[in-house]
Amino acid sequence: MIREWVAERGSERWALLLHDRSEHEWAAVDGTGHAIDIYSLGESLAELMRSCASCSFREALTDAILTIAGMRRFDRLIVECSGLVEATMAAAVFNDAIADEEPLAGLARLDQLVTVVDAATVWEGVRSADALGERGMSGGEDDTRVLSELLVEQIEHCSLIALNRSEAIDGNCRERVITLLRYLNPEAEVLLAADRVAGAARILAPRDRAEHGISFQPGWAKLIDGNDSLPESSQEWSTGVFRASRPFHPERLWRCVEEDWPGVLRCKGYFWLASQPDRCFSWEQTAGSRHFEWVGHWWVATPQPEWPTNEAFLRRLKSQWTIEFGDRRQELACIGYGADQETLFARLKRCLLTTDELLLGEEAWRRFADPFERATQEAGSREDETDPE
């Protein structure tokens, strides 16, 4: 696909930076170092090692871009990352450079972040519970991600989605896939890769406010914010946000987590537990994976002198505040296909504390048996075992 786009570049000189050249279709091209003639006009090829960790990847990518930009021979640079690399890592290279006023910010900007999606397999992929290792795609022994998790993340965090092999599926399937992409990432433009002229034109088009970095607001985040830019719900498709102020009972919620959630393709948001009332947890789910993480303390449990003081933060906090619970709340956005959202939300509602349980007070809540606490401790122990420090 990149070959086709490059063919439409006109007289511009492009550089191509590959994440891993060893298994690439251009592996047989001769050349040494960070510069190589691939096409008749003399593009550039540089290679990044696939095995590097996220920090090393960012450092290697920054160094490679600085090297190529320093040649001052090219008008544009295309970076092709491994499918195992999270798109947010590539974006962070430029966003951090802008925020920290690093040299890279003065030499290059990120115009587009493109995710290439295989139209013939993406529907099966977002519904898959297969671990990456089962597909021969694992990034290492510690890579426990599943296919649906990686695929959804890459779709959510891009500015353009190139739909490859769209001609391989019928019209109804193609429309369903495009609808899925627009639910997951309503801000991204969906391009049919078969139209290489249009694809090249869009990739060449500068992104608005590119000098300010790139940000993402996936469909789940827009749902929580009340943004109406997502496609309308239909008989098959459903979207909604489960909202509540009361805390979850840890054991009832754990049992709910362990049950099947048929039809739910994406669920993400934040929640709190009666047994850990100061902690804010994130919830992240695809059709093939479901996990939670402690991400910090609620502001009501944080000394006020430590709060940010900007007006936008204070306005938002005020809109979320209740007298009884402060900013603590349940907000879980769901996107489903063939999902019974009403039944699912009713199940979640039954996991909230009852009025009698609320009257027991926080001291009693903290003594509730809590499977989430045990799971958090076990996860922390595993991280300590793999920490090189």
Regions found by a protein language model. Name each.
Residues M1-T144:
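Nucleotide-state-sensitive switch-loop elements of NTP-binding domains
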Residues E23, V122, A131-E324, Q330, ...:
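C-terminal accessory "lid"/substrate-recognition subdomains
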Residues A27-Y39, E175-L181, A346-R350:
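Short, aromatic/basic amphipathic alpha-helical patches
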Residues R58, T88-A91, G171-E175, W254, ...:
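Conserved strand-to-helix beginnings and helix N-cap segments that scaffold or border functional pockets
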Residues E80, L113, C158, V190, ...:
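Residue-level signature of catalytic and energy-coupling elements of molecular machines
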Residues C256-E259, L344-L352:
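Short amphipathic alpha-helices in soluble, non-transmembrane regions
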Residues Y337-Q341:
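Helix N-cap motif at beta-to-alpha junctions
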